[in-house]
Amino acid sequence: MWLANFFVSASTTMIVPFLSLYIETLSSFSNGFVQRWSGYVFGITFLMAFLVSPFWGRFGDKRGYKKILMATGTGIALSIFFMGFVTSVYQLFFLRMAMGLVTGFIPTSLAMISAQTPKSSAGKTLGTLQMGQVSGSLFGPLLGGMLADRFGFTYTFFITSFVIFSSVLLVLFGVKEKHLAEKTAKRTSYSRKEVLSYIFHHPALWVMMLLTMLIQTGNFSIQPLLALYVNELHGPVNLAFFSGMAFSATGLGSLLLARKWGDLGDRYGHRRILIGLLLAASFFFIPQALASSLSVLLVFRFLFGMAMGGLLPCITAAIRVQAPGSIQGEVLGYNVSFRFLGNVLGPLLGGIISSHFTISATFYVTAFLFFAGACMLWIMQKLRKDSYAKAS
């Protein structure tokens, strides 16, 4: 599963650094048009994924996660393959929309491994799995940038599609899902309404889901614009490659500490680690807005990645601890929905802010989002401590 996550993450991030550059080649557009449509094309995938992911989650509970992994992987591969043939931004938008219907390979793999992991070691295990995704996101943008500069965008789409389909074969022949029949036999069937009611009556769960949305909104607000920002700092020479470096710097930082943050969360509490990581992420975004050179941007993208690497594994582990086993799969599925919602809102937010102000302004707004997330989690912690004190 680690290898499959690595290949899928590497392949999908191969096309991200030059997506806005690809739009520019489709016609003669203004900068504002490219910035807006970079956000739209980037975000529509995750809007569709947000709408359909609860159905994938329920299907996984009933039929198994492996089938979802194979279906989503094949769909992603086909969608990216046909992107190499588009002649307009609207065709690209439609294919990204179709891709959203089957996007969810990596979140589904996290849900599958989480459901089969003891709660006491959930953070460390998910952090290890996260390293596969992060490793792929580290090498993917660099490889995609080099391929795009050398062979062009079209062949890069074809290569990406082939690698993702190889991951599907890896899951088919190399992954064995444990159905845990002895546990599922004791479970009670809950309706979707009952599961939602449970979530809404347990703040520890829905606050974590809101945090997932905030984190993804902040992280994805700048990603479609990063190539344009690198162009402002460095110029057009080998732009796809240096844009890939900016993406990979974040991945390298995450790779170094993803497993460590999960381990610390298991030992000292996931919420405590999350507050520190959110504050650090907020702090490291501000210098990116003030960067005067590509090297400065790369340094702080790397530092941001060190904080970012532990956020989603700690949140998933915290939900894993809080949710009863009988509804755990579906609860994690709703968290995936909030994750995709953040993936939708982020590019839209970044595109709107950058087109009306500057790309630098997007960094400031993102820093505020991470800071707000830390404050929200701290307030929840304080309220829980006060309620425990009154009860005792």
Swiss-Prot record:
GO cellular component: plasma membrane
Signal peptide feature range: none
PROSITE patterns in alphabetical order: MFS
Keyword presence, Transit peptide: no
Entry-linked SUPFAM superfamilies: MFS general substrate transporter
GO molecular function, one term: transmembrane transporter activity
Residue stretches in coiled coil: none
Protein location: Cell membrane
Main location: membrane
Membrane topology, record value: Multi-pass membrane protein
Keywords: Cell membrane, Membrane, Transmembrane, Transmembrane helix, Transport
Listed transmembrane segments: 2-23, 38-60, 73-95, 153-175, 195-217, 237-259, 272-291, 297-319, 331-353, 357-379
UniProt keyword DNA damage present: no
InterPro entries: MFS (IPR011701), MFS_dom (IPR020846), MFS_MdtG_subfamily (IPR050497), MFS_trans_sf (IPR036259), Tet-R_TetA/multi-R_MdtG-like (IPR001958)
Family in the record: Belongs to the major facilitator superfamily.
Protein's UniProt name: Uncharacterized MFS-type transporter YuxJ
Taxonomic source organism: Bacillus subtilis (strain 168)
Gene: yuxJ
